[in-house]
Amino acid sequence: MKKFFIAALLMIFANCACAEEIPENGEGGAASAPANINHVDSIYFAQTNFYELTSGNGRIVLTHYPPALQTTEYSCGPIAALTVLRWFGNNDFDEKTLIRDLKTDTKTGTTLSNMSKFFRELGWEVHDTFDTPHFDDIADFQKFVMKNLSEGTPIMVENVEYGGHWRVIVGCDTMGTENLYDDVLIFEDPYDTSDHKSDGFAVGSLDRFFSMWFDRNDLPENKHEQPWLTARPK
């Protein structure tokens, strides 16, 4: 829910054949970022086509995962949910209807409890922070991530980025080593404006994400750490 208002220019995803503009609920958010924030020849960020990326050599990725960018400053949760719905072939929702159905607040965003409730009411199988033991270390977390991805299940996560931000883990790469500290997470990021390629995908260190995986507003005080959920049709 980053307060980052930019002059309206809808993003053109020239570098990702699948990436979809979603101007369904206004002209804000990452979808309104100017095209000149993208740099095909960036020396700082690799211009990987994550949509076409495949698994292998220690990497598990959900190939052809459908990316999307939020069109408001507060709808990262609805967009994360939207991509999960589309991954499993449900095209009955859009950003606007999910903002309503998830009871998204324009100031504080979307709660984990409302995300889980929405998918349960669809009749989907849902697991989340509230029904699962705390991950004690990154080894447990990495095993959890790899297991879900190997089963074709994306993982919706929220952490303190931007003061509170929903993303979806759609890939993990061990880099072919036993050392967990070089592992990379691949995210579907509804506010993907920071890597010179606004295609809806971003990468980050598994270790660094794990160390910053806590919430400022969403969860009860004794449940601030490790907000996540998985949802898939039964």
Regions found by a protein language model. Give the residues of each.
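Positively charged n-region of N-terminal signal peptides that target proteins for export
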Residues: 1-4
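Active-site-adjacent structural segments surrounding the nucleophilic cysteine of cysteine proteases
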Residues: 18-112, 182, 231-234
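Bacterial N-terminal signal peptides
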Residues: 7-15
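Active-site-adjacent substructure of cysteine-protease-like catalytic cores
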Residues: 133-188
